C-alpha cells in the first residue's frame, strides 16, 4: 500500500468507453425477445432512453436505471465518485429526482487489497451524499477487473418527464458540459497528461447533472438525454431518429475541454471513438477525422443534451443561469433529411 495503486492499469477499458458498441448491442437485443407491453411502463427500452419509467399512478412514475464500468481514473475514491455521479445522471436526464441507490461492485480480490475497494465505495457514497440520497445496499462479486456503479431509483411527475425521442423541428440544442472526457482520460492512462490538465476531466465527471431536474419543469424543453459512452453524435443520432427530425451542429460552438487538440495530436483517442463512428457513421453526413475524434469521443458522466423550442428558450436560459450555467446553442433540429446529423 506504500506505492499508490493505478486503477486504470487493471482494466482493459475505461468508464463509459467500456460500453458494448451500439452495433453489437443491437444484435444482442434483437434476439432477446420482445418487451412486455405493460401500459404502465411509460418508458422502456424501445427508444434507448436513459432510464425506465413505470407509473405509480396517473401523475407520478418511478424511474429506474443502472450504470457501472471499469476505472477511468487511477484514484479509487475519485473512481467511486465518478461512477456514482454517472449513474445518478440518468435520473436527472429524465427530469426526475433520485431517491436511493444500491452499489454494484466487482473486485479482483486476489490482486487488489480490500482497502482499495473500500475507498471506491466511499467515493460512491460521497456522490450519493451530494445528491441527497442514501447508498442503501448493494451486491459484490469476485471479478477479474475492478467494476463499480449503482442501480438508482428515482421519481418523476408525468408532466415533468423528459424523453430522448420527443424533440421537434425548430428546437435549439444545448450541451451542459464540455466534450473531451475520453480524450483526457486516455492521456492519463498513457501517462501523457500535462500538469496543468490534472483533475480537469475528473472535476467535470464529478459534477452532478442536477439541472436536469429543474429542466423537467420547463415546457419548452422538448427532449433531453445525457451524453455518455456513445459520444455526442451517437446520442444525437438517437434523439434525431427517435424524434423523426435531423440535427445541424456548428462544430465551432461545441464546448470542449482545454487541451483536447493537443492530446488528439498526441494520439490520445480512446477505442470507443472508432466503435461509436462504426455504429452511427452511416447516419452522419461526411466529416473530417479530427471532428469525428471529438464528436464521437465517449463521455463518462457527460453533460445533458437539451432540445429547447424557441418559445421556451428565454425561460430555459434564465433557469440555466440561476444554476450557474452559461449556455449557448450548439445547433438546431430541422425537418428530417437523409442524414440524422450534419456538422457545419
Curated annotation (Swiss-Prot):
SUPFAM superfamilies: PurM C-terminal domain-like, PurM N-terminal domain-like
Catalytically driven reaction(s): hydrogenselenide + ATP + H2O = selenophosphate + AMP + phosphate + 2 H(+)
GO cellular component: cytoplasm
Binding site for ATP: 19, 47-49, 67, 90, 138-140
Alphabetical keyword list: ATP-binding, Kinase, Magnesium, Metal-binding, Nucleotide-binding, Selenium, Transferase
Enzyme superclass (EC): transferase
Cofactor(s) the protein requires to work: Mg(2+)
EC number(s) given by UniProt: 2.7.9.3
Assembly with partners or alone: Homodimer.
Protein name, as recorded: Selenide, water dikinase
Gene field: selD
Amino acid at each position: 500500500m506504500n506505492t499508490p495503486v493505478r486503477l486504470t492499469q487493471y482494466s482493459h477499458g475505461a468508464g463509459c468507453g467500456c460500453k458494448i458498441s451500439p452495433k453489437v448491442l443491437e444484435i444482442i437485443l434483437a434476439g432477446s425477445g420482445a418487451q412486455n407491453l405493460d401500459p404502465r411502463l411509460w418508458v422502456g427500452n424501445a427508444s434507448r432512453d436513459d432510464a425506465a419509467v413505470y407509473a405509480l399512478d396517473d401523475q407520478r412514475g418511478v424511474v429506474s436505471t443502472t450504470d457501472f464500468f471499469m476505472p477511468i481514473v487511477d484514484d479509487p475514491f475519485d473512481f467511486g465518485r465518478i461512477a456514482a455521479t454517472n449513474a445518478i445522471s440518468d435520473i436527472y436526464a429524465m427530469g426526475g429526482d433520485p431517491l436511493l441507490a444500491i452499489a454494484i461492485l466487482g473486485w479482483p480480490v486476489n490482486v487488489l487489497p480490500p482497502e482499495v475497494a473500500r475507498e471506491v465505495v466511499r467515493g460512491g457514497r460521497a456522490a450519493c451524499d451530494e445528491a441527497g440520497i442514501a447508498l442503501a445496499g448493494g451486491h459484490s462479486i469476485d471479478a477479474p477487473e475492478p467494476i463499480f456503479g449503482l442501480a438508482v431509483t428515482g421519481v418523476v411527475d408525468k408532466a415533468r418527464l423528459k424523453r430522448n425521442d420527443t424533440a421537434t423541428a425548430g428546437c435549439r440544442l444545448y450541451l451542459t458540459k464540455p466534450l473531451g472526457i475520453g480524450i483526457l482520460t486516455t492521456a492519463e492512462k498513457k501517462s501523457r497528461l500535462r500538469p496543468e490538465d490534472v483533475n480537469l476531466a475528473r472535476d467535470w465527471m464529478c459534477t452532478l447533472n442536477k439541472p436536469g431536474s429543474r429542466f423537467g419543469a420547463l415546457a419548452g424543453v422538448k427532449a433531453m438525454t445525457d451524453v455518455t459512452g456513445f459520444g455526442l453524435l451517437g446520442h444525437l443520432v438517437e434523439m434525431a431518429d427517435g424524434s423523426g427530425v435531423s440535427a445541424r451542429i456548428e462544430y465551432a460552438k461545441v464546448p470542449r475541454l482545454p487541451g483536447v487538440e493537443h492530446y488528439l495530436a498526441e494520439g490520445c483517442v480512446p477505442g470507443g471513438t472508432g466503435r461509436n463512428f462504426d455504429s452511427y457513421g452511416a447516419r452522419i453526413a461526411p466529416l473530417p477525422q479530427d471532428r469525428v475524434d471529438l464528436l464521437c469521443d465517449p463521455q463518462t458522466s457527460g453533460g445533458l443534451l437539451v432540445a429547447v423550442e424557441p418559445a421556451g428558450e428565454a425561460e430555459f436560459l434564465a433557469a440555466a443561469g440561476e444554476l450557474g450555467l452559461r449556455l449557448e446553442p450548439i445547433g438546431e433540429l430541422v425537418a428530417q433529411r437523409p442524414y440524422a446529423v450534419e456538422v457545419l
